[in-house]
Amino acid sequence: MDFCDLIETMTQAIVRGDGDGAAACFADGGIYHDVFYGAFPKAEIPRMVSDYFHRDAERFRWDIHDPVGNAEVGYARYVFSYDAKIAGSEGKRAVFEGVAVCRLKEGLITSYTEVANTSTGLQLLGFSTERLARIVGRQIDELTARDEVAKHLGP
């Protein structure tokens, strides 16, 4: 399956609540790194879909735009939205945009990560300034811990 079909298959399986279908897009040893919920190995992706995504939200929409890839890596811009079920945000619509980065092997995903503009969606959910600051703080910690970022932080 080419990357365009693979990313559509994976995202739409998650939208439907089909965790097994999403996991089938991953190679053995593959990991889904979610910007909110953390890292889930292939065997845990069905639980991520049911116990996190569909526990906390409903009426998902995940549109993929401009996917490009080769045998080793794929990138796809996306717009993702849902109605929240979490306390204090029930029924509010969150909208996010981002870029999915997929490492690939033999037509399957070995690593799914994303660079996402999360503050817009969380603001739409009514998150407090303090809560947003904690989330941004975690994102700063994750970014600055990466080896490739070290040379950007100082001599």
Spans of model-derived segments:
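A generic structural micro-feature
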Residues: 43, 72, 90-96
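Hydrophobic pocket/interface hotspot
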Residues: 10, 22-23, 30, 45, ...
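Short beta-strand segments enriched in hydrophobic/aromatic residues
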Residues: 26, 80-82, 102, 116
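Short, cysteine-centered beta-strand-loop-beta hairpins and adjacent loop/turn segments enriched
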Residues: 55-58, 82-94
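A short hydrophobic beta-strand element
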Residues: 71-82
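Terminal "cap-and-tail" regions of soluble proteins that handle hydrophobic small molecules
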Residues: 1-15, 108-110, 116-155
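A solvent-exposed, acidic/Ser-Thr-rich amphipathic alpha-helical stretch
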Residues: 19-73
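Short, surface-exposed coil-to-beta transition loops
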Residues: 60-62, 93-100
